[in-house]
Amino acid sequence: DCLLSRGLGDVYKRQGYVYVAQIAMGADYNQCVKAIAEAEAYPGPSLVIAYAPCINHGIKVGMSKAQTEEKLAVEAGYWHTFRYNPALKAEGKAAFSLDSKAPTGDYKAFLNGEVRYNALARFNPERAEELFAKSEETAKERYEYLNKLITLYGGEN
């Protein structure tokens, strides 16, 4: 159920007065800079949540490719980028912008590119396949949910 998978950003978006952005610098540098600038300029509390791979993710191609990993996460639909600016709603403008596009990457290939997931696939392939499929379905539901927010908050994709 996608209701159970809503994240930290959703909690604060519902407050109605908190600027919230989800970013991945390697996926879209301009969106990242824009979100940080908007958060800084916003006259109330701001929350910027970034996808930032670390050594414990076990990126198979190495940490020097962290920016590429961020891009792959967004392309696969593992991570979505958006901005919610309540000040825009007060101005009669769209408050929500879903900045990432519909996923086009291979979700399971993305998961298998990180040791933290790949280890499960090696240890228990059947269970990994089940969990990876469930995770992919949840990610699709999450994107659909974010698309619905465009209508709810008045926004763009």
Where is each model-derived feature located?
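Glycine/aspartate-rich loop-and-adjacent alpha/beta segment that forms the canonical ThDP
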Residues: 34-130, 134, 144-148
